[in-house]
Amino acid sequence: MTTSTTSRLAIGASCVLIFGATALAQTSPSPAPAAAPPAPKFEPTATITTPGYPGVGPADSKLRIVNLPGGKKLHLLPATLDTTQWGWFDNAQAPVLRVNSGDTIALETMMHSHNQVVPGTTIEQIKKTRTDFPGRGPHTLTGPIYIEEAQPGDVLKVTLNKIVPRAYATNFNVPGLFGQFPTLYADGQVKYLYLDLDKMTTEFLPGVVIPLKPFPGTLAVARKEPGRYSSVPPGEFAGNMDIRDFVVGTSLYVPVHVPGALLWTGDSHAGQGNGEVNLTALETAYREFNITVEVIKGKPLDFPRIETKKSWISMGFDQDLNKAWTQTKAQTVKLLAELRGVSAEQAEKLMPSVSDCRVSQVVNVKKGIHCLNPKNARDREDLERPTRETPKYLVSHAKDADLNKAMNDASMGMIKMLEADKKVARLDAYGLASVAMDCRVGAISDAEKNVHCVMPKSIWVKQ
């Protein structure tokens, strides 16, 4: 298969409020993923290497800059083999772009595996891109981008201004590998979907229409540890968070670990369910991903946060969903104490009544939970946690002392419900749950942890 080298994406930004400054140690630290086996060092060059045009010569960075009002700059960053890496983060990687705090970047992203997962690629070929490169992630990452003022201990704010996806997306489960239930799905399938960017919908199945909600699955700064690491697990550097609320108009705040921060993005999504259970979302690439970067000094942060118009999003990650919850709870308590000006003990008591917590994903080695926390004390998030079908939702509820098992039971319950009640084929039900199901964390105690997975009935439309 030939590898396409073009894919378009741009990023833009808007301003948001700043957070409190007190840092809190991570409550449930996870062991850092082991470095990948040694591989040939990728040495990027500034030479354009588009097939058919060898030796064009070094790129001129000045030709990638557009001046904006107020003395700011817009940087244009195309996705080529020279401006992307496949599957690795490495803080020794030479920057492909250098910008200043306050600058805006309009960049492109590629589909998985350097644009190899495109309409026509079979599930067997997709599986081969994973099995032939053990330890390597599937994501093609545009970057790294060096932000001149950023130093360890600073915070990098990245605001999403605009997202323009390609005209298509894919959803697939790799046979017998990855996903929430790899042993139950030894068979796999790939679906290619048309994205109607006028209506902002895609038809997943005949009569099943999914609203599009584009967001970057992966946005990362460099880790503090040297070496080459898979792009799959998220962490304190952000990375493969797969938080579907991270959309245009929101901002990521992430601690800086190395000079220049080194910013990457990829794993571009047109939409996703909370859980992403079959491994993939509506996987696409961006013709334009428009962002603005800002370095914040003197306000240390120990873990990423996301700011929306009305909420702050806290998060946690671990291979064990119970520990991911413990970390998310600690980050949420810290955030609520800052927002409301109360003690940690008071914030912990407040959390169940104001924080809307969801299972972000369970397929990225480190599973994720995130909580939406209203900025205004009078506001409330969506705390609906149904245990049976409602006029609005199909519902699958499970409880167990182990949050991993509760999540497994609730999500599989929804998949079986789609098969039995909606007559959706087995692999299609797995995929539909991955792109449209919303798994919510309910009441939590040592003895019992509740997960409520809901599916909006509104996605079934009359033919």
Please state what every model-predicted region is.
Residues 1-13:
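Bacterial N-terminal signal peptides that target proteins for export
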Residues 80-90, 134-142, 229-237, 414:
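Short, structured beta-strand/loop micro-motifs enriched in basic residues and often containing a Trp
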Residues 60-133:
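N-terminal, Lys/Arg-enriched amphipathic/low-complexity engagement segments
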Residues 112-123, 163-173, 260-270, 360-363, ...:
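Short, Lys/Arg- and Gly-enriched loop/turn segments at beta-strand edges
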Residues 214-240, 244-322, 333, 384-401:
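Conserved mixed alpha/beta catalytic, RNA-binding, or beta-rich assembly cores of soluble enzyme
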